[in-house]
């Protein structure tokens, strides 16, 4: 049973005094899917952020960007915050009810994509039987191979060989199926020290684009994505591909704790 039945990221709002060599060990010790270190802006953004998983740094990841936007923009009453990332400036548009932020939409970097050639081996390691939709690798910072299965029950039943999967590929495997009024998604990223990710914005945007490119939805159609159920951390994201060059992902976040972290 997860301690928190939601997706957790931690944000160091001023990381200037944390030595560079401590960033990765600290993220590994905290062991959340992502740890964010915030610095003064270097360019035209409001702040610069660096994102670490337990095993490495990412140039971009959706879930921690939304969380960081809520943490930083909340007290400032901003309607939009521009965050500098390894993939450039990411604008996050915020929706409020009174002083409280209830939702955020981020403009995502445009991914590049290509066919994933060792598809048969990946499906063997996942224990998955794909549909006829092509397996394609999308890179938006971290890469994800999108794998459609025939039903949400098949997605729920997946039990990958994580050790072999981590040795086989550096990217994540994003397995999905249509489930009534939404899409069910599970994302496995053992190479980054995250066997299963509870919420993956950097896969949600590419999923909307993938579905639109292959005619499963129309460009401009908003989809709801549910993820994290099997690991006790259910999440909901929304995504829309307005074109191949314009992708937005949205979700909600709240601050559940504040405090000081004292480094020895």
Sequence positions of predicted segments:
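Active-site proximal loop and beta-alpha junction motif in alpha/beta enzyme cores
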Residues: 1-60, 66-264
